[in-house]
Amino acid sequence: MIRILFLVIFIYSFLISKELKEVSLQLPWKYQFQFAGYILAKEKGFYQDINLDVKLKQWDENVDVIDSLTNNKIEYAVLRPTSMIDISKGKELVYLATIFQSSPLVLVTDRSSGISSLSDLKNKRIMTSGDLGSDVSLLSMIFSHGIKLEDLLIQTPSFNTQDLLDKKTDLIASYISNEPFTLKELGGNPIVFNPKDYGFDFYSDILTTSKNTYKMKKMK
């Protein structure tokens, strides 16, 4: 959290106008614990203190975040490591900070599903943000047990953990700080598949901007 605040202050310390400048930050998911630094900074007025009006945008499956960055529709976004693939394909992005040294993404199921190992995932329903391949840690963990993406039935997330107990889905791709706790509170018995436990430990939540935005800020 402190790293985020210092980073924002460092980037914008040159702003001396009292008029607030509106900037947008796209988050990779709905509001929850791991975005506390960004949210708290806004609520406490830290952005306003350095003349910024920061608009926090929650995840939207209809928004192409990379396109929005490179076409100046948004100024900043929190991306996953697979965005390096976009950079290798010519997308002009600049990484500003890596917030998590380990990806918080995990797969969660309830014990009543009968799923006890990753080998049981074939033909199972998974609620995820549309492209499971966008997280290299989850993908590597799944592949290591002989499961292919085409073996999975991808569902649009409902953001309702109760769906695991109601048998509307088999697994949820979630942040470790969120759904496992919620499922237990609902009376479930969560089983968590964490890539870190299988030897796949990657950075995550990378604060990013476009090269164009980065150059414009440096020139001011």
Where on the chain are the PLM-derived regions?
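Hydrophobic h-region of N-terminal signal peptides that target proteins for export
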Residues: 7-17
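Extracytoplasmic "Venus flytrap"
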Residues: 22-41, 60, 71, 131
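Short, well-ordered beta-strand elements
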Residues: 19-31, 52-58, 123-127
